[in-house]
C-alpha cells in the first residue's frame, strides 16, 4: 500500500523505515516533519514464496519463532518501488535511518561484504543477497526457545539483579546474547562460518551502505551483552556467550558501537543511486530498535509515558534515572547522552486482545462483522471497572497469555481470580465461577495489561503537583490499538495522566516516523543541539496529536490503586503454582 501527501515538496527529504514483525514501512518527511510519501509492504499479503503467518515461521517443538531474512530483502525493493511509482524524486533524499524489530539477529556468511559491495542495479536485492547469510533465518522477539541459556546468563554475574544492573535487563528469551549462545551450541559449524552478526536495525543500515553497519548505541542494550555503566561489551558475558569459540572471535563478529546515535555512517551504495535515483551524497544514519525509535516520534518529556499497542504491549518512558530492576528494561537513549529509555514489554498484546474479541464475536454468531471490534468495545464499556457492580463485590482480574509471557515469566495459559481488597483474600476461579465469559474478559484483558504497566512503573513516576498522586503527565498511545477509544478510556482510568490520554496521529507508523525524525536531527542539528530541542522547535502539537480520553480521575485511580495490590498477589500466586519465582 502506498500513499502520498498533497503538500508541495520543498527542500531536503528524509526516509525512515520500520522493519517490524508483520510489515516493512517507509515514510518520507521534509525538514518541517511533515509526511509527504509512505509505502507499506505487508509480509503475509504481499510477499511471494514464503509460507509465513503473521510474518514468521514457527517450530512449536522447540518454541522457536523466526523470520526468513530473504523476505526482508524482497520487502525493501518493493517499498522503494512503491515510493518510486508515487513520483518520489529520490535525488532530494538527504538522509536515511530506520527502526528494526529489537533483539533479532542476522548471521552473515564469509562472502557478505563482497556481495553487499557488489550489488548490481539491474537485479533485485533478494536475487543477489540470498547467499550472503550463513543462516537463512532471524529469531523473532516471540521466540521462547532459550530458557536454559537465560538461566546461564542470569547466574553468570551472580543473579538476575546483577545482570540487570550491568546490562539494563535480566536475561530474556528474545535477547540477542542468549539467542547467540543457543545458536553457537546448536549450529557450531555455521557459527564458525559466520563472519558478522547484525541486529535487525544494523542489518537494514547495512543494505543501504553496501557493507556491514555497526550496531546502534541504544539497540545494543537489548542483547544482555553491553555493559551500560562501562559503555562497552561486558567481557564476562562475552566469554559466556562465545563459549569455545572465544571472546575475540565474538567481538569481531559484533563489531564496534559508535556512541553518537546520529553519526554519518557513509553514503548510500551505488545500487540505490543507479536503480532508484538517490543522490550519491545521501547519508545513511544508524538505524535503531523499534522501541527506541518510537520514543523519537515526538519530543517526549521525562514526565510523559508512551504505550505502544501493537502485536506486543509496550510501555516507554525517557528518564535521567537509571534504576535497573529484573522486571524492567533500561537502554541508552537513542539520541541523547545522559538520558535512558525505560521499557516494559509483553509478548501478549494485540494477539491476546484479538483472541477475546474473536470469542465474543463467535458467541454472538458473528463470524466476519464489518467492525470486528464493535462487540468487544460495547461489552468492555458496559462492564463496570474490575467487574464490580458494587464496592463490596470482589474484583475480577486475570492473566491472558495465548503465548508464553516474558513478564512475568510464565507458560501460555489463562488464569482468572476474584480479589477482595477489604480482606486481601485472593481466590482462583478454576471454572470461571462468578465470571460471565467471554464478555467479562473484554474489560478484564485491558485492565490486566494496564495494571501490569502501573505496577511496574510506579517507582519511576512522580506527582505532577498539588494533591495529585504520582503518575505520568501525559499518556501517549501509539500502534494499531491506539485507534481504539475504549482501550484509551480504560488506560487513562488505570494509568492516570494528569493532562489526559493522547493518540499520536500517525501512531501506527510511530517507529518509521521516529526513524525519519532521527535522520532530520542527525543532518540538520547545530553543534551540541539535542534531538529534543531540534524536534521540539519544529513539532506542532496540534497537528500531530489528538486527545482521545480523560486521564486521571480520582475515584477510578484510587480503585485501581487497590487493584494493583491484588494484581501483584495474583502474579505471585501463579508464579508459585507454576514453580517459577
UniProtKB/Swiss-Prot annotation:
Chain sites annotated for binding substrate: 103, 174, 290-291
Q: Report the enzyme's class at the first EC level.
A: transferase
What switches on expression, per the entry, is described as: By D-xylose, L-arabinose or L-arabitol.
E.C. number: 2.7.1.17
Residues annotated as binding ATP are 373, 480-481, 484
One CC-aspect GO term: cytosol
Task: Kindly list the GO molecular function terms attached to this UniProt entry.
Answer: ATP binding; D-xylulokinase activity
Q: Per the UniProt entry, what is one GO biological process?
A: xylulose metabolic process
**SUPFAM superfamilies linked:** Actin-like ATPase domain
Give its localization. Cytoplasm
| Keyword entries, A-Z | ATP-binding, Carbohydrate metabolism, Cytoplasm, Kinase, Nucleotide-binding, Transferase, Xylose metabolism
Enzymatic reactions: D-xylulose + ATP = D-xylulose 5-phosphate + ADP + H(+)
Family membership, please give it: Belongs to the FGGY kinase family.
Its biological purpose is as follows: Highly specific D-xylulose kinase which participates in the catabolism of xylose. Xylose is a major component of hemicelluloses such as xylan. Most fungi utilize D-xylose via three enzymatic reactions, xylose reductase (XR), xylitol dehydrogenase (XDH), and xylulokinase, to form xylulose 5-phosphate, which enters pentose phosphate pathway.
Q: What's the protein here called?
A: Probable D-xylulose kinase A
Amino acid at each position: 500500500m502506498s500513499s502520498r501527501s498533497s503538500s508541495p515538496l520543498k527542500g531536503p527529504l528524509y526516509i525512515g523505515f520500520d522493519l517490524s514483525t508483520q510489515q516493512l514501512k517507509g515514510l518520507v518527511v521534509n525538514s518541517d516533519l511533515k509526511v509527504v510519501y509512505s509505502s507499506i509492504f505487508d509480509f503475509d499479503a504481499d510477499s511471494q514464496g514464503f509460507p509465513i503467518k503473521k510474518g514468521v515461521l514457527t517450530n512449536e517443538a522447540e518454541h522457536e519463532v523466526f523470520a526468513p531474512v530473504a523476505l526482508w530483502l524482497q520487502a525493501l525493493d518493493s517499498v522503494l518501488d512503491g515510493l518510486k511509482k508515487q513520483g518520489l524524486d529520490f535525488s532530494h533524499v538527504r538522509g536515511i535511518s530506520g527502526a528494526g524489530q529489537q533483539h533479532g539477529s542476522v548471521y552473515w556468511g564469509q562472502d557478505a561484504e563482497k556481495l553487499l559491495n557488489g550489488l548490481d542495479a539491474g537485479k533485485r536485492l533478494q536475487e543477489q543477497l540470498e547467499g550472503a547469510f550463513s543462516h537463512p533465518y532471524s529469531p523473532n522477539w516471540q521466540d521462547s526457545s532459550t530458557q536454559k541459556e537465560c538461566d546461564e546468563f542470569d547466574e553468570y554475574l551472580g543473579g538476575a539483579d546483577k545482570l540487570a544492573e550491568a546490562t539494563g535487563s535480566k536475561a530474556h528469551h528474545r535477547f540477542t546474547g542468549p539467542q547467540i549462545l543457543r545458536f553457537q551450541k546448536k549450529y557450531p559449524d555455521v557459527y564458525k562460518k559466520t563472519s558478522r552478526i547484525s541486529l535487525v536495525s544494523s542489518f537494514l543500515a547495512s543494505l543501504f551502505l553496501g557493507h556491514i553497519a555497526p550496531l546502534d548505541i541504544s539497540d545494543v542494550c537489548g542483547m544482555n551483552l553491553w555493559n551500560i555503566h562501562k559503555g562497552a561489551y561486558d567481557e564476562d558475558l562475552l566469554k559466556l556467550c562465545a563459549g569455545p569459540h572465544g571472546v575475540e572471535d565474538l567481538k569481531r563478529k559484533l563489531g564496534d558501537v559508535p556512541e553518537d546515535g546520529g553519526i554519518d555512517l557513509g553514503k548510500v551504495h551505488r545500487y540505490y543511486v543507479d536503480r532508484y535515483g538517490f543522490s550519491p551524497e545521501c547519508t545513511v544514519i544508524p538505524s535503531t530498535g523499534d522501541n527506541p525509535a518510537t520514543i523519537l516520534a515526538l519530543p517526549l518529556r521525562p514526565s510523559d509515558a508512551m504505550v505502544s499497542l501493537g502485536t506486543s504491549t509496550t510501555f516507554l518512558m525517557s528518564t535521567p534515572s537509571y534504576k535497573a530492576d529484573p522486571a524492567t528494561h533500561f537502554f541508552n537513549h537513542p539520541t541523547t547522552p545522559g538520558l535512558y529509555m525505560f521499557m516494559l514489554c509483553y509478548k501478549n498484546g494485540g494477539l491476546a486482545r484479538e483472541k477475546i474479541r474473536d470469542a465474543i464475536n463467535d458467541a454472538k454468531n458473528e463470524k466476519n462483522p464489518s467492525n470486528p471490534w464493535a462487540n468487544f468495545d460495547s461489552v468492555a464499556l458496559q462492564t463496570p471497572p474490575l467487574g464490580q457492580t458494587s464496592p463490596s463485590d470482589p474484583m475480577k482480574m486475570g492473566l491472558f497469555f495465548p503465548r508464553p509471557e516474558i513478564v512475568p515469566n510464565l507458560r501460555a495459559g489463562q488464569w482468572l481470580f476474584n480479589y477482595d481488597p477489604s480482606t486481601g483474600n485472593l481466590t482462583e476461579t478454576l471454572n470461571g465461577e462468578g465470571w460471565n465469559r467471554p464478555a467479562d474478559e473484554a474489560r478484564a484483558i485491558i485492565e490486566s495489561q494496564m495494571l501490569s504497566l502501573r505496577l511496574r512503573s510506579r517507582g519511576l513516576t512522580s506527582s505532577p503537583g498539588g494533591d495529585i498522586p504520582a503518575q505520568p503527565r501525559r499518556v501517549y498511545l501509539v500502534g494499531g490499538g491506539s485507534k481504539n477509544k475504549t482501550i484509551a478510556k480504560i488506560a487513562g482510568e488505570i494509568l492516570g495522566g494528569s493532562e489526559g490520554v493522547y493518540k499520536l496521529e500517525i501512531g501506527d507508523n510511530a517507529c518509521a516516523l521516529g526513524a525519519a525524525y532521527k535522520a532530520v536531527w542527525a543532518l540538520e542539528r547545530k553543534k551540541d543541539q539535542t534531538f529534543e530541542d531540534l524536534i521540539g522547535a519544529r513539532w506542532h502539537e496540534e497537528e500531530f496529536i489528538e486527545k482521545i480520553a480523560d486521564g486521571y480521575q480520582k475515584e477510578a485511580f484510587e480503585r485501581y490503586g487497590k487493584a494493583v495490590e491484588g494484581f501483584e498477589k495474583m502474579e505471585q500466586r501463579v508464579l508459585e503454582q507454576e514453580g517459577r519465582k
